[in-house]
């Protein structure tokens, strides 16, 4: 998921919202999806992940690379987290 960083100073947020919408749409279509973080990360050999993606895909430098999304058919269906195992003490409403 890319965004033109020359057009917006909030390109990271814009790309994150777009990626989230794609993840939700994939689920709605019965597909599985996984966010692969790129921005601010390095490859196993220490290279900048954003630049690696730019080089592999021919992405112009002005585009920021937020993430990759792997989308496909699910190998298995996971059950939602059991609510009694959730750490509700980490949830704050109206005040911290």
Where do the model's predicted regions map?
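Acidic, surface-exposed loops and disordered segments
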Residues: 1-96
């Amino acid at each position: 998921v890319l965004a033109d960083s020359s057009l917006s100073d909030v390109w990271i947020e814009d790309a994150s919202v777009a990626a989230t919408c794609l993840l939700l749409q994939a689920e709605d279509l019965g597909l599985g999806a996984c966010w692969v973080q790129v921005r601010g990360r390095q490859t196993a050999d220490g290279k900048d992940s954003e630049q690696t993606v730019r080089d592999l895909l021919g992405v112009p430098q002005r585009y920021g690379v937020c993430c990759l999304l792997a989308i496909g058919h699910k190998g298995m269906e996971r059950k939602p987290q059991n609510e009694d195992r959730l750490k509700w003490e980490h949830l704050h409403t109206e005040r911290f």
